[in-house]
Amino acid sequence: MNAPVLVLDGPPGAGKTSLLARMVCALADDTLWFTEPNARLSCGLAAPVHPSPAGHTLWFLRHELDKSRAMRRLACDPDTRLLISDRNHLGVLAYCYATRAEDSLPYRTARDFYARRIAPELPETVLTAILLVSPDQSLTRRGNVAELPRWKQWFDEGLLERLHRFYTDIAPSLCPTPPTVINTDGATPETVLAQVAGVLADAGLDQTARRLTSATARAPRPPLDPQFADTYAQLGGLEAFGHPFTPAIAHRGGTVQLCQLGALHRDPAGHTRLWNPLAAPVRRAA
């Protein structure tokens, strides 16, 4: 059986990336994952064609198309038990629905792109967990103030209210199969993890679910590992990656460290680069 895809999506502050980090540490070689899409880490022909909001939205839509195609290939890898994605097309559509930025791509245009181009390319089994958080809780969890100027829009209360409305009322109808909706207000990370583990158990991944719930939680916000420091800085540092969310962990013969907006990978030969499952399968160590 091909590996299922688990998508984690929802408004900022819902705990998606923290949950992904716990899953990556717990499941190790049995999983491949996609970090949150990040146009800032793309370059050359892969970069956005125009710096406008519409240009960036088109980049995200095309990225989701490429990712859907890659996931179909990666799901066939016998070494992979589970693929995990921090956001998918829902994140792009949510932004188009909620933003009031000038020169933004119309929501209907983005939705039609999903229906015509992305949906037919999705893998056989896509499980979706929508993590909800109220606007007030979203702001509180993230300290109420943007750490960097470019993140300021994600602290706008009106935007957060519209995102919450999208994920509550609209997003479930845009999932390949009915999603599991988890309200994280007042919930502990262990409670949310247990609900996601239940999604996997219901899909037949009992052993994977047990590994998740039995794994010890690691300390949040670990330091950047020195082996990744140079590449982290060269590719944009905090502005591009955000903060580290896992320590350096062994993965299929190499080492990876997951950050908020990307991950870095060091292969067995000592080459360090951006973690990018779109490029080629990451094989288990011989």
Please identify what each model-predicted range represents.
Residues K16:
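Conserved lysine of the Walker
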Residues Y95-T168:
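A glycine- and Lys/Arg-enriched "phosphate-lid" helix/loop adjacent to the NTP-binding pocket
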Residues G143-P149, W154-A215:
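NTP-dependent small-molecule kinase module
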Residues P11:
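P-loop (Walker A) phosphate-binding loop of NTP-binding proteins
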Residues L19, M23:
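Hydrophobic positions on the alpha1 helix immediately C-terminal to the Walker A/P-loop
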Residues W59-L122:
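Glycine-rich phosphate-binding loop used to anchor ATP phosphates in small-molecule kinases
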Residues D206-A286:
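Extended, compositionally biased repeat/scaffold regions that form elongated interaction surfaces
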Residues V24-M71:
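Conserved substrate/cofactor phosphate-moiety recognition/catalytic segment
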